[in-house]
Every structure is written in C-alpha cells, then in structure tokens.
Amino acid sequence: MEYMQVNRANGRAANELRPVKLTRGVMKHAHGSCLAEFGDTRVLCAATIEEGVPGWRKGAKAGWVTAEYAMLPASTGKRCKREHANRKGRSMEIERLIGRSLRTVVNMKALGEYTVTVDCDVIQADGGTRTASITGAWLALRDALAMWVEAGKLERIPLTGQVAAISMGVVDGNTLLDLDYSEDSHAEVDMNLVATDSGEMIELQGTGEQAPFDRKRLNALLDLGDKGIAELIELQRQALA
C-alpha cells in the first residue's frame, strides 16, 4: 500500500516508526529490566519474580504474571500528580492491558507457583506509553525468566512467543503509524494493536475520536499495525542477540 507524503516530526513517513531503542539490563536489582524508547517516549520496565501466587490462584499448580503502570510526575509537559492510594483509572486500564498481553505468551503451568510482576514506569511521555510499555515489558519478563532458569528454579523459559504493541491513527485525514503526542492529541481515529511474533492479535483498541471510520480505513490501519509489530519483534530479537 502506498501512503501520501505527510509532514511529520523528524521527517518520518506515514508508515514509519519513531526511532526505537530497547536497552536490557538497566536495573541492578530487578530480575529483568528494559528501557524502552519510542522517540521521546521512555518507559522503564522491571520484572521481579516472587515465590507463591495470589490466594485465588493457590492449588492450581500454575503461576501468575501481572503488571503495574505509572507516570512519573515530570514525565509530561505539565507535572502530573504522583499516584498514591487513589490510582487513576487510565493507569489501571493500561496495567491490566500489559498484564493480559504478557500472560497470553506464558505457559503458566511451566512457570509453576511463582508470581512475576512487571513494573512499567513512564519517565518521559510523548505518546504511545502503553505500546512502549508492552514492548519493553516482554523483554524484561523474558530476562527475568531466563535468570530463574540459570538459578535452577525453572527447567526452561516458559514463553510461547514474543509480544509487541504499536499505535496507529488517522490525523488530518492521513493514516499514520506510531503516533507521537502532537499527533495523538488531535487524531480523528486512535488505535492500538498488541500482537505476537506469529502475527496473531492479542488486543485491538480503536476509537473514532472525532469521526467514524469505515472498513477500508480499518484495513489500512491494521496493515500499518502489522508492519509496525513485525519491526518491533525484530528489534526485540536484535536486543537479545
């Protein structure tokens, strides 16, 4: 599919990702960690493994993977309040999405009765914080599980595949990949795709923020998303090499 020439930040094409950098092992005490950078968006992802599972999971002889998400106060242009007991609905929605996404590629029986918590802290936000979180969280999770294998606590890494996420949208009538904040803040259509390395979708979130969209536009957005996911999956592999 051909895309119209549009004027985007950094001279990006409509179907081009922002510069993406995935840096592993950035935290000394985490079992696995990754700094995920999508342009000016930066998310610190840290995975910790603990013995035992939530009470409702006991007796299942299977593990659990969960996530927490938060934005640091100075991560945006205007200071956002630090979250304490009163969690923001948006943050809770995103951390549930991260947890769901990761669980789809974990063999819980092979994990055994361990709980993995992946903390995703946004240190700088410029759009796409949830997609950067998921992409970096998978690497942090993978490295934490690999550490447990090396320690003799697991026989093998209980992963069935990779997971990455990317945003798509319609801005000023143009179908775009990987929106930054300036684009996302006035997008007519906003969409997020979470998918595996085999191309299977885990979650698709799409909203006509300012205008409805038809099946043709949806297909174009999905084509962009597939392209972005494939590139992110390859970047994850390169980070592991």
Predicted regions and their residues:
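Glycine-rich, charged/polar anion/phosphate-binding loops
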Residues: 20-23, 29-32, 50-53, 103-105, ...
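Glycine/charged-rich beta-loop-alpha catalytic/anionic-binding loops adjacent to active sites
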Residues: 78-82, 114-124
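Structured core elements
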Residues: 21-23, 35-37, 44-46, 66, ...
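Short, Gly/Pro- and small/polar-rich lid/capping loops
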Residues: 1-37
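Glycine-rich, flexible beta-strand/loop modules in the N-terminal catalytic cores of phosphate-handling
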Residues: 26, 34-111, 201, 205-219, ...
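Conserved mixed alpha/beta catalytic, RNA-binding, or beta-rich assembly cores of soluble enzyme
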Residues: 96, 119-147
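Short flexible coil/turn linkers enriched for glycine and charged/polar residues
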Residues: 16, 28-30, 39-41, 61, ...
